[in-house]
């Protein structure tokens, strides 16, 4: 699917430089995936979505808004939301936006082979 979407400021409705950035496009794609799953949540359709690094390099306020949005949609539509996050990208989150033990399924590290996804060092 090809589409063009631009970010406009709310007051003057003019396109801003945010529309040209990689972070904006990443969030737009993630929101589209999530909206699609929400729309089809009552049908025989996928019940999960996976996004890699969608919070990377995002402003802290946007991270918190996105986490709030994902939690709401996942609970409301019974969707499993799978997200990869680099730990350093979550340090500044306020406590209510930090991931709970119930939300974290796997923690990977490069400290030892056992902490890697396939438990193998190359």
Show where each model-derived region lies.
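Extended helical coiled-coil dimerization/tether regions that scaffold
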Residues: 1-20, 40
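Structured extramembrane domains adjacent to transmembrane segments
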Residues: 7, 25, 48-50, 64
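Conserved catalytic network of the ASCE P-loop NTPase/AAA+ motor domain
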Residues: 20, 39-43, 73-77
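GG-anchored amphipathic helix commonly corresponding to the ABC/SMC/Rad50 NBD signature/C-loop
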Residues: 23-47
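Single-residue recognition of alpha-helix boundary sites
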Residues: 40, 63-64
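Walker B catalytic acidic pair
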Residues: 52-54
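Conserved D-loop-proximal element of ABC-family nucleotide-binding domains
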Residues: 59-60
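C-terminal lobe/lid and adjacent interdomain/linker elements of RecA-like ASCE P-loop ATPase modules
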Residues: 65-122
């Amino acid at each position: 699917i090809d589409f063009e979407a631009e970010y406009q400021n709310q007051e003057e409705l003019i396109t801003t430089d945010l529309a040209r950035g990689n972070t904006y496009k990443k969030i737009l794609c993630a929101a589209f995936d999530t909206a699609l799953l929400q729309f089809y949540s009552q049908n025989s359709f996928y019940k999960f979505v996976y996004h890699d690094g969608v919070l990377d390099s995002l402003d802290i306020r946007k991270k918190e808004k996105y986490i709030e949005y994902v939690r709401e949609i996942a609970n409301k539509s019974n969707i499993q939301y799978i997200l990869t996050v680099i730990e350093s990208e979550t340090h500044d989150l306020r406590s209510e936006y930090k991931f709970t033990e119930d939300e974290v399924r796997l923690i990977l590290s490069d400290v030892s082979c056992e902490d890697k996804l396939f438990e193998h060092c190359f």
